């Protein structure tokens, strides 16, 4: 059966209200998730939140962004406090819950390209620093998942690894600190190994890598051990769809970002018809649409709470319609 979920971000600063909305909309036949509320400021953003999970590595917020430091400062403590609040509210909102429940973390290459070293360059330029970051993230994820399992013992946790920075790391498009140069591209084999280390830290839990770029390195992702890929399908051309077909045929599931975040009044057919047409065009059987999870095209933080509810509800309705299409 096709089902719906979300990318992760949600508008506003009230995590209790956000969790209530997510559970109401998705717990029946969708995949609910721990919403992220970046409007709360530093530490609630994707990089700060991800850096806060790192084991034995301290970060703090500097004018250039998050940077490794010798000991955690005020911003790192704020990050920890925000996560603690979210986990406490999650435990209350999902008390007695049994089923799948998704959490999101920033991926190793997005973190390595966004967290700065002491000397004022991105971590990704330093092989040793990148290796330490990956190991730290893997250990931090293990600890995080153990805590989540204790808080919501009836949940089967799904881990979404957000890698918006992966294409830039692979293409050598990241600017240096001076802005006059570009950082050398990371070898795809090295990138796959780094992702694999983090994915393995999730154990036997279902994992999905989310990347909302137009050129997602699907062959690389197929070699990481991930169970699914999450894409903004509106950005995919015919060549990319051929790679999607190869990915699905290799056994990975597709999370299709089909609901535009401005589509609060769209019809279900407007959402699923382009997906079904592309699916057919690459020779995939309609019956395999049951392996597709439908999501908004990206996070919902830029909407109003009412708008976020509308977009998320449309994804739920579209997933039900897609299930009917798969059985036709």
Residue ranges and their predicted role:
Residues 1-130, 220-227, 252, 290, ...:
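Alpha/beta catalytic barrel-like cores
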Residues 21-22, 218-221, 239-247:
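A short acidic, amphipathic alpha-helical/loop segment
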Residues 34-37, 102-106, 160-162, 208-212, ...:
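A cross-family glycoside hydrolase active-site/sugar-binding cleft signature
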Residues 75-92, 131-146, 269-275:
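Glycine-rich anion/phosphate-binding loops
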Residues 90-93, 144-148, 191-201, 240-245, ...:
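Structured alpha-helical segments in the cores of large, soluble enzyme domains
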Residues 118-133, 160-184, 257-264, 295-304:
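Active-site-proximal beta-alpha loop/turn segments in soluble metabolic enzymes
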Residues 136, 140-236:
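Active-site loop segments of alpha/beta catalytic cores
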Residues 227-328:
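Catalytic-face loop-and-helix region of soluble metabolic enzyme cores
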């Amino acid at each position: 059966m096709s089902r719906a979920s979300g990318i992760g971000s949600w508008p506003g600063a009230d995590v209790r209200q956000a969790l209530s909305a997510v559970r109401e909309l998705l717990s029946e036949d969708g995949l609910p998730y721990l919403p992220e509320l970046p409007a709360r400021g530093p530490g609630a953003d994707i990089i700060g939140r991800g850096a806060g999970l790192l084991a034995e590595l301290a970060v703090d917020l500097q004018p250039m962004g998050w940077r490794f430091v010798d000991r955690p400062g005020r911003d790192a403590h704020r990050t920890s406090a925000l996560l603690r609040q979210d986990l406490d509210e999650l435990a209350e909102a999902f008390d007695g819950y049994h089923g799948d429940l998704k959490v999101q973390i920033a991926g190793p290459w997005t973190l390595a390209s966004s967290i700065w070293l002491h000397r004022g360059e991105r971590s990704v330029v330093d092989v040793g620093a990148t290796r330490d970051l990956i190991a730290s993230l893997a250990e931090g994820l293990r600890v995080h998942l153990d805590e989540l399992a204790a808080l919501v013992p009836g949940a089967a946790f799904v881990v979404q690894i957000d890698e918006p920075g992966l294409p830039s790391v692979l293409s050598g498009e990241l600017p240096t600190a001076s802005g006059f140069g570009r950082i050398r591209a990371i070898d795809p084999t090295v990138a796959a190994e780094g992702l694999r280390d983090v994915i393995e830290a999730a154990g036997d839990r279902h994992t999905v890598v989310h990347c909302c770029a137009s050129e997602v390195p699907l062959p690389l992702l197929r070699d990481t051990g991930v169970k699914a890929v999450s894409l903004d399908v509106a950005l995919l051309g015919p060549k990319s769809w051929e790679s999607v077909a190869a990915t699905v045929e290799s056994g990975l599931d597709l999370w299709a970002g089909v609901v535009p975040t401005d589509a609060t009044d769209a019809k279900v057919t407007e959402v699923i018809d382009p997906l079904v047409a592309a699916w057919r065009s690459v020779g995939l059987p309609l019956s395999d649409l049951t392996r597709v999870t439908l999501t908004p095209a990206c996070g919902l933080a830029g909407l109003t709470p009412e708008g976020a509810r509308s977009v998320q509800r449309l994804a739920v309705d579209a997933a039900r319609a897609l299930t009917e299409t798969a059985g036709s």
